[in-house]
């Protein structure tokens, strides 16, 4: 999911994807 783009970058997730 690309929801991390608006939430920032959680541990284990990339800010780009």
Curated annotation (Swiss-Prot):
Keywords: Bradykinin receptor impairing toxin, G-protein coupled receptor impairing toxin, Glycoprotein, Hypotensive agent, Secreted, Toxin, Vasoactive, Vasodilator. Its main location: secreted. GO terms for cellular component: extracellular region. Glycans are attached at residues 3-4. Expressed by the venom gland. It is found in: Secreted. GO terms for biological process: regulation of blood pressure; vasodilation. The keyword Calcium does not apply. The keyword 4Fe-4S does not apply. GO terms for molecular function: toxin activity. Belongs to the bradykinin-related peptide family. Induces smooth muscle contraction. May target bradykinin receptors (BDKRB). May cause hypotension. This is Vespulakinin-1. The lineage of its organism: Eukaryota, Metazoa, Ecdysozoa, Arthropoda, Hexapoda.
